[in-house]
């Protein structure tokens, strides 16, 4: 009787340890990695704490590439946070405005939540922002938003799949972003 009970306890302990392990996004060949604390240095006014992971394809800065401004961002934040539209818009606006520096006025950034979700499930966001790195123009990016709160670890996990390509589930860029990163983040 003792052995089955001990086995159950061991399984529970191991599964609890696995649940507390932070998620690590994969790094495809030739993609650039950025892992940092949250809020990032350019958006210190944001109140939430945790980490972010970004993965950039080799052609991220090539305005002629389909992968221009196409990348995932994984947030792992402490607490049940960014729970509503107002907080989500604030997080995106402060992040983008800080990223653009003084090159583009914050009030010109437009963030719109679409009424029709991506893949009939995930909220879609349209971000009319700015490219401070390559073109100094205002590309429109589509963002597929994934969020969950894990009570056991008191962690909010958010995955943003972002691209300058209009969202189309048959588009190769969107297929790549979904295939490489969605399941690794647990969505």
Predicted segment positions?
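Secretory pathway targeting signatures of secreted, lumenal, and periplasmic proteins
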Residues: 43-84
């Amino acid at each position: 009787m003792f052995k089955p009970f001990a086995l159950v306890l061991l399984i529970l302990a191991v599964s609890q340890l696995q649940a507390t392990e932070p998620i690590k996004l994969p790094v495809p060949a030739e993609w650039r990695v950025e892992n940092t604390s949250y809020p990032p240095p350019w958006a210190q006014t944001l109140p939430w704490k945790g980490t972010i992971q970004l993965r950039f394809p080799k052609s991220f800065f090539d305005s002629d590439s389909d992968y221009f401004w196409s990348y995932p961002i994984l947030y792992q934040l402490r607490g049940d946070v960014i729970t509503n539209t107002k907080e989500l818009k604030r997080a995106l606006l402060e992040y983008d405005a800080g990223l653009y520096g003084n090159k583009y006025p914050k009030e010109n950034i437009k963030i719109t939540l679409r009424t029709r979700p991506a893949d009939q499930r995930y909220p879609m966001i349209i971000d009319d922002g700015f490219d401070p790195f390559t073109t100094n123009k205002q590309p429109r990016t589509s963002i597929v938003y994934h969020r969950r709160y894990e009570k056991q670890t008191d962690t909010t996990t958010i995955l943003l799949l972002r691209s300058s390509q209009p969202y189309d589930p048959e588009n190769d860029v969107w297929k790549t972003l979904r295939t490489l990163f969605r399941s690794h983040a647990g969505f």
